[in-house]
Design a protein with these regions (language model features):
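Conserved catalytic core of the tyrosine transesterase superfamily
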Residues: 1-168
Length: 168
């Protein structure tokens, strides 16, 4: 049987999460996102007007629109400002190639890789070489970072249940 958390357990878990990872966990819980779906969110995937998120190539390669809790809007705006600071710094680096885009899109809109909207909402802390083309890019946060934090926080709270990202 799957692990189910009570509302008070979820509240305690989310509040005890490390601050820099809390929004990820809140989005997973509140919008029903899977681990890689939340990791791959881009700035342009957020629709503040309709309070929804766009998930591209989710499980089974499907696209879907999910609800966005209005309580998360201030935190999301802060996160976008955080991404913008990385973006501005990255664009000053002549070797920076932008984010990786789907092949057809990269051919059709070569400048899109350096537009803010295509950048990950939860970026890695450092630039790295793309294994496909060797270009200098900023990838998304490593998923194991969130997985370890969720498990560690659940252990710290002594919930007595095996809690993973999938539980959220």
């Amino acid at each position: 049987l799957p692990t189910v958390l009570t509302q008070s357990e979820v509240r305690a878990l989310l509040l005890a999460m490390p601050v820099h990872l809390r929004l990820l966990a809140q989005l997973m819980y509140g919008s029903g996102l899977r681990l890689m779906e939340v990791m791959r969110l881009c700035v342009q995937d957020i629709d503040f007007n309709y309070l929804c998120l766009m998930v591209w190539n989710g499980k089974g390669g499907k696209h879907r629109r999910v609800t966005l809790a209005s309580e998360l809007i201030p935190a999301l705006r802060e996160q976008i400002a955080y991404v913008q600071r990385f973006y501005m710094t990255d664009c000053l680096n002549d070797a920076y190639a932008g984010v990786a885009l789907p092949t057809a899109l990269a051919r059709k809109y070569p400048a899109a890789s350096k537009e803010l909207g295509w950048h990950y909402l939860f970026p890695a802390s450092h630039l790295s070489r793309d294994p496909v083309d060797g270009a200098l890019r900023r990838h998304h946060l490593d998923p194991t970072t969130l997985q370890k934090a969720v498990r560690a926080t659940a252990r710290q709270l002594q919930l007595g249940k095996p809690v993973t990202c999938h539980t959220l």
